[in-house]
């Protein structure tokens, strides 16, 4: 099954809902960064939330999420675009902890329970929108829920889950975001709160093979949900050799000549996708000649 996202309304417009399958997306991130189990879960949850938050934007708008906790995983960075493209990385991918007796990974131990979630939105204005909230649990779903309440004043529920196999490969990933719209009735809010208390963990629902639509039906009730749009989502990095060449050219002739003199081979590393671009002395000479 391919990864895709669903945008929906529920309860006659009182609730805005997003749901996504990110199994392939998170698998690609795990493959590129060689993340261990708990790191995979933390990065996967962040990518999943970022994918849905990116889908709230329009056109060529994009956002960056930084989760900076006090845990050993270090900062998590995610870039997400309105078109469903997402990329991300963890600073220390080789972090893992024993799970609970129920098999749940202790993501909070990797992320940390103190720090901040920062969201930077590039929405075409002169200055980007920057929102920030403290980490409240380190489990990430609760942290993004709190972010929406504090920074965007939008009552929300964020559920994100990643299932990881013993060999570190990703079995399933996905999640949902529910947002209460202004004027929603108390009965609607109470109904959703009650359902959220009763449903299994998101990762369990995903493991059962539920599609994004079925995930929303499980949370809200099939008769309450009206799907508006679906869109493909994927791990996609914007880096390329041509872009790296442009960055090198921007350094100027003097610095490029110094690089050519000092380095047999120049390597540029993209943190987001882990690609490495190598430039020989001859490559650097060609760049200098094109200045």
Curated annotation (Swiss-Prot):
Q: Where does this protein chiefly localize?
A: cytoplasm
Q: What keywords would UniProt list here?
A: Chaperone, Cytoplasm, Disulfide bond, Redox-active center, Zinc
The disulfide bridges present are: 237-239, 270-273
GO CC annotations, alphabetized: cytoplasm
Q: Could you tell me the Gene Ontology terms of the biological process aspect for this record?
A: protein refolding
Q: Where would you find this protein in the cell?
A: Cytoplasm
Alphabetized Gene3D superfamilies for the sequence: Hsp33 domain, HSP33 redox switch-like
Could you give a GO molecular-function term held by this entry? Answer: unfolded protein binding
Q: Which SUPFAM superfamilies match?
A: Hsp33 domain, HSP33 redox switch-like
Post-translational events: Under oxidizing conditions two disulfide bonds are formed involving the reactive cysteines. Under reducing conditions zinc is bound to the reactive cysteines and the protein is inactive.
The domain of life is Bacteria
Q: Which Pfam families match?
A: HSP33
* Described purpose of this protein according to its UniProt entry: Redox regulated molecular chaperone. Protects both thermally unfolding and oxidatively damaged proteins from irreversible aggregation. Plays an important role in the bacterial defense system toward oxidative stress.
Task: Give the record's family classification.
Answer: Belongs to the HSP33 family.
Name assigned to this protein: 33 kDa chaperonin
